Amino acid sequence: MPVVGDTKGYENQNVRISGGEYRANLYSKNWTEANLHESIEKFAGKNPVITTTDKGKRIYENPITKVQVVEDVNGKYFRIFDPSISGKRNYLDLNGHVPNNKTLENGKKQGRTKAEYNQVTHFKIKE
């Protein structure tokens, strides 16, 4: 397994990882696995506009709704982004909802923490 983040003690090895791969190594054990191609078709449509970024992201954008499936190529995960939603929480779950709240055992709703929100809006790419 590659060393995550700091390379102290590994000065003679080229094992530092960063960005999406770093986040995936830290957090992906709590992420749901999902089919990237099905999500692209569902949210970005059959003919999405595809762009890539300098940071290793491939973006599939619906030309009408502007909703994007953002694939982190190195991290092997994706998120679903809706630019029409204002504020910080503009990523969607697999049902197309902003998962701001969770339902407790007693049936009441409670707001999610940032960590919980990130956990339910990151999806490991099903291979």
Mark where each language-model region is:
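Low-complexity, glycine/serine/proline-rich disordered segments
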Residues: 1-59, 73, 77-127
